[in-house]
From Swiss-Prot:
Keywords: Acetylation, Cytoplasm, Elongation factor, GTP-binding, Hydrolase, Nucleotide-binding, Phosphoprotein, Protein biosynthesis, Translation regulation. GTPase component of the Pelota-HBS1L complex, a complex that recognizes stalled ribosomes and triggers the No-Go Decay (NGD) pathway. The Pelota-HBS1L complex recognizes ribosomes stalled at the 3' end of an mRNA and engages stalled ribosomes by destabilizing mRNA in the mRNA channel. Following mRNA extraction from stalled ribosomes by the SKI complex, the Pelota-HBS1L complex promotes recruitment of ABCE1, which drives the disassembly of stalled ribosomes, followed by degradation of damaged mRNAs as part of the NGD pathway. It comes from Mus musculus. Disruption phenotype: Embryonic lethality; embryos fail to develop after 8.5 dpc. Conditional deletion in the in the developing cerebellum and midbrain leads to severe development defects in the cerebellum characterized by the absence of multiple cell types. In contrast, conditional deletion in the adult cerebellum and midbrain does not cause defects in neuron survival. Defects are probably caused by ribosome pausing, due to inability to rescue stalled ribosomes. This is HBS1-like protein. Residues 321-325 are annotated as: G2.
Length: 682
C-alpha cells in the first residue's frame, strides 16, 4: 500500500539535520532585512549578561538600614517601589529609587521624573573593597561590606552566643569577635571610626590566598570581660508608631464632617441624571468630560442621558439606560464631605440597592412628578414603596424627597402637594418622623433648584424652601462607633498593581492604621493592611464611617469574597449558620411557615436561608409574647424566629452593633420581612 511505503521509506535524517538555536527567535539562514530584524526579532547576543557580585546582593538586601523609617513609612516606601519597578524594571537599583522616593517625600511622580532625567540609566554595580581578616594582608579574594558608624548604631551586629564558665548570655554585641564555623569567617565591628570593616568569607566562594592555618586562632571573650561595655540588645518584632486616631478624627471633623448618602427611587425617576447634573454644577465634572458625554449620548440616540453617564460608567448601563450597580463618588458641601452612592431602581437589582442602602447614613428619595409615572412607582409593584421600607429598615432615619421632573408639569403647586400628601402619609407609616423628611421640587435635566435656589417665577411664587444641596448640607451625621472593635464589610475585591490585593468597603466600627493585623471572617484567615486609600488618596488611618480601599498582604485573594467582614484578631466577629432574630413581616401573599425558603440580605451578603422555627409572635409596641409556637406568620406581624443559612455568615447582635445587626429577607423577587439579630447559635 502506498501510504505504508511512504512511512517505511521516510528519511528521518532530514529532521535532525539542522541544529536548534534556542537563543534566537529566527534562524540566521532566513532572508530578512536588518530594519525588520531590529524591530521584530529578539537576539540574545545584543543583550550581554551582566555579572553581579555577591556583595551587590548583600548590600541591596540591606539598602534600607541607613534610613530610620517607621513601619508605616516602610509600607509606603515598598508601595512606591512597586509602582516605580513597573515603569523602570530592573535597570535601576533599589538604593537609587529609595533615595529618590525619600528625597521627594513618597511622591512617585517626582521621584520617577528625577530618575528618568538622569543621562543614560545603566545597571548599577558597586565595586567592592578588599579587606583582610584579622588585620593581616591576604592574596585571596574575600567579600567585604562597608558599614558606617550611623548604620552600626541603628542595627548593631549581634554575636550568636557568648559562653562563660558560669552562665550563658545571648544577644550581646562582641567587639572584635572573630569566629569560624564551617569555613565561614565573621568579624563583628565595634563602635569606632567609620573606617572599621566587616569581613565575610563565604564557603561558597573559592579562596586561593592564605590558607586557614596561616590565620591567627580565634579568641573568645567571656561575658565578664565584656561587662564594662554597654551593649544595646535588639528587640524581637518591630515597634510601630501609633496614631492617636481620636485626636486626628477631631481635627478632621473640625473642618468638614463625613456623611454617606444613598440615592433611591423607582426606575426612570431620574436619579442618575439628577445627581450627575449636581456634580457637574459643583465642578466635580469638567466641561471637557461633560461635552464628551453629550456627544456620545447623542450618537447613541439618548441625548437626555448625558448627565446620567457621569455615574453610569459601564457600557451595559449606558446601553440599557438603567443603573445596575451602585455608583460611588464624592462631593463637598459647605460643612460636609458627602460620599454619594447612586443605587439602581430596577426591581431586578434590588440586592445591589440593599448593599448601597446598608452603607448609608441618610437618603434622597427621587420620585417622578409626571402624570402616571408617580402613580406607577408608588402603587403595588412599584419600587418607591419598597425602597422607602428598605432604607428605614436598614437604619436610615433622615430622608430628602426630590420631586423630580417638575418642569414637565409646569411647576404646578397642586401636583407637588398631591405627591407630598400621598408620600408623606406612607413614610410616616414606614417609621419616618415628619421633622426628618423634607420635600423639594427639582428638575434634574434643567438643573433647577439643585445647587442654588430657583429663580424661575413659576416656582418661586409658591416655594420658598431650600434647594437640594442645602437640604443635604443640613443633614445631621450619626454618631460613629469609634470605641468599638474594628469591623469592615467587604463590598468589592480586586487585584491591584503591585503586591497583595485590594478590598473595598465601609468601616462600620472602630478604626484601622497602616500595618495593622486583620482577621477575615468567615474564612478565618489573617493578613496585614499594607495601605489605606480614602477618596483616592493614601492615608495612614481611617475610622468608622469611611469608605476605604485596603491593600492587603499575607493572604490569598481566592479566600476572600464579597460579604466577608474584617475585624481585629483579638476581638473577632462570630460566624454561624443558625441564629435567632426578631422580624417584621411586610405585605406578603403567601404566609411564612416552618421551612419557608428565603434569601438573606445582610450588608453586602446575599445568602440562601431557611426559617427553621417559628418561636413566638410578639407585640409590636411592647415586645411581649402574644402567641407561642405559631403555625404561620401573616403580613404585619412581629415574630421571633430561628433561621439557618447554607454557609457560615459573620453576624453581630443588634444590641452590640446596630449597624451589623440588621438584615432583610426576600422571596420571589420581593421583600417579605426585615429583622434584627437577637441571638447567635454556635
Amino acid at each position: 500500500m502506498a501510504r505504508h511505503r511512504n512511512v517505511r521509506g521516510y528519511n528521518y535524517d532530514e529532521d535532525f539535520e539542522d541544529d536548534d538555536l534556542y537563543g534566537q527567535s529566527v534562524e540566521d539562514d532566513y532572508c530578512i532585512s536588518p530594519s525588520t530584524a531590529a524591530q521584530f526579532i529578539y537576539s540574545r547576543r545584543d543583550n550581554p549578561e551582566e555579572e553581579y557580585g555577591y556583595e551587590d546582593l548583600r548590600e541591596s538586601s540591606n539598602s534600607l538600614l541607613n534610613h530610620q523609617l517607621s513601619e508605616i513609612d516602610q509600607a509606603r516606601l515598598y508601595s512606591c517601589l512597586d509602582h516605580m519597578r513597573e515603569v523602570l524594571g530592573d535597570a535601576v537599583p533599589d538604593d537609587i529609587l529609595t533615595e529618590a522616593i525619600l528625597k521627594h517625600k513618597f511622591d512617585v511622580q517626582k521621584a520617577l521624573s528625577v530618575v528618568l532625567e538622569q543621562d543614560g540609566v545603566q545597571p548599577w554595580k558597586e565595586k567592592s573593597e578588599r579587606a583582610v581578616c584579622a588585620g593581616q594582608p591576604s592574596k585571596g579574594k574575600s567579600v567585604i561590606s562597608r558599614s558606617s558608624q550611623s548604620e552600626s548604631e541603628i542595627v548593631p551586629k549581634v554575636a550568636k552566643m557568648t559562653v562563660s564558665g558560669k552562665k550563658q548570655t545571648m544577644g550581646f554585641e562582641v567587639p572584635g569577635l572573630t569566629s569560624e564555623e564551617n569555613g565561614l569567617s565573621v568579624r563583628a565591628p565595634h563602635k569606632g571610626p567609620p573606617g572599621d570593616d566587616v569581613s565575610v568569607a563565604s564557603p561558597n566562594i573559592p579562596e586561593t590566598g592564605t590558607p586557614k592555618s596561616a590565620l591567627p586562632p580565634p579568641s573568645l571573650q567571656t561575658s565578664e570581660e565584656l561587662g564594662s561595655t554597654p551593649t544595646p540588645v535588639r528587640k524581637s518584632g518591630k515597634l510601630r508608631q501609633q496614631i492617636d486616631v481620636k485626636a486626628e478624627l477631631e481635627k478632621r471633623q473640625g473642618g468638614k464632617q463625613l456623611l454617606n448618602l444613598v440615592v433611591i427611587g423607582h426606575v426612570d425617576a431620574g436619579k442618575s441624571t439628577l445627581m450627575g447634573h449636581m456634580l457637574y454644577l459643583l465642578g466635580n465634572v469638567n466641561k471637557r468630560t461633560m461635552h464628551k458625554y453629550e456627544q456620545e449620548s447623542k450618537k447613541a440616540g439618548k441625548a437626555s442621558f448625558a448627565y446620567a453617564w457621569v455615574l453610569d460608567e459601564t457600557g451595559e448601563e449606558r446601553e440599557r439606560g438603567v443603573t445596575m450597580d451602585v455608583g460611588m463618588t464624592k462631593f463637598e458641601t459647605t460643612t460636609k464631605v458627602i460620599t454619594l452612592m447612586d443605587a439602581p431602581g430596577h426591581k431586578d437589582f434590588i440586592p445591589n440597592m440593599i448593599t448601597g442602602a446598608a452603607q448609608a447614613d441618610v437618603a434622597v428619595l427621587v420620585v417622578d412628578a409626571s402624570r402616571g409615572e408617580f402613580e406607577a412607582g408608588f402603587e403595588t409593584g412599584g419600587q418607591t414603596r419598597e425602597h422607602g421600607l428598605l432604607v428605614r429598615s436598614l437604619g436610615v432615619t433622615q430622608l430628602a424627597v426630590a420631586v423630580n421632573k417638575m418642569d414637565q408639569v409646569n411647576w404646578q403647586q397642586e401636583r407637588f402637594q398631591e405627591i407630598t400628601g400621598k408620600l408623606g402619609h406612607f413614610l410616616k407609616q414606614a417609621g419616618f418622623k415628619e421633622s426628618d423628611v423634607a420635600f423639594i421640587p427639582t428638575s434634574g435635566l434643567s438643573g433647577e433648584n439643585l445647587t442654588a435656589r430657583s429663580q424661575s417665577s413659576d416656582l418661586t411664587t409658591w416655594y420658598k424652601g431650600m434647594c437640594l444641596l442645602e437640604q443635604i448640607d443640613s443633614f445631621k451625621p450619626p454618631q460613629r462607633s469609634i470605641d468599638k472593635p474594628f469591623r469592615l464589610c467587604v463590598s468589592d475585591v480586586f487585584k491591584d498593581q503591585g503586591s497583595g490585593f485590594c478590598v473595598t468597603g465601609k468601616i462600620e466600627a472602630g478604626y484601622i492604621q497602616t500595618g495593622d493585623r486583620l482577621l477575615a471572617m468567615p474564612p478565618n484567615e489573617t493578613c496585614t493592611a499594607k495601605g489605606i486609600t480614602l477618596h483616592d488618596e493614601p492615608v495612614d488611618w481611617a475610622a468608622a464611617g469611611d469608605h476605604v480601599n485596603l491593600t492587603l498582604v499575607g493572604m490569598d485573594i481566592i479566600k476572600i469574597n464579597v460579604g466577608c467582614i474584617f475585624c481585629g484578631p483579638k476581638e473577632p466577629i462570630k460566624a454561624c449558620t443558625r441564629f435567632r432574630a426578631r422580624i417584621l413581616v411586610f405585605n406578603i401573599e403567601v404566609p411564612i411557615t416552618k421551612g419557608f425558603p428565603v434569601l438573606l440580605h445582610y450588608q453586602t451578603v446575599s445568602e440562601p436561608a431557611v426559617i427553621k422555627r417559628l418561636i413566638s409572635v410578639l407585640n409590636k409596641s411592647t415586645g411581649e409574647v402574644t402567641k407561642k409556637k405559631p403555625k404561620l406568620l401573616t403580613k404585619g406581624q412581629n415574630a421571633l424566629v430561628e433561621l439557618q443559612t447554607q454557609r457560615p455568615v459573620a453576624l453581630e447582635l443588634y444590641k452590640d452593633f446596630k449597624e451589623l445587626g440588621r438584615f432583610m429577607l426576600r422571596y420571589g423577587g420581593s421583600t417579605v420581612a426585615a429583622g434584627v439579630v437577637t441571638e447567635i447559635k454556635e
